[in-house]
Amino acid sequence: MQFNQVENPRGNPLKIDGQIWIFAPLSLGVAEKLMPKLKTFDPSDFALVADVAYGSLKRNYPDITRDFIADELLDVGHVNDVFETVMGASGLVYTGDEPQEGDSGE
């Protein structure tokens, strides 16, 4: 299925079944809603992964549906890659590029 992409998508690319999808940073509203579950991420929480992917992809592909993501686009093998891609795009993963809080840098 083909979805229209916004003119200037932002985020991180991830190739799924031969197609490049651009996973955008989560909006504040989506992050706020999902934060309690994001703090204790369990890879077997497939509903959370579908919600995260939907919140991300909806920003770059306005016509995409959660059902398409959960039922057709993603499979169990994509769980970690999708989660890491979205969290990285959203700035919710420490990358080692900047000192962590409390790190004196000495």
Language-model region placement:
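Extended acidic low-complexity intrinsically disordered regions
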Residues: 1-7
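Short, surface-exposed, charged amphipathic helix/loop patches that serve as local interaction elements
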Residues: 7-9, 17-106
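Short aromatic-centered micro-motifs
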Residues: 14
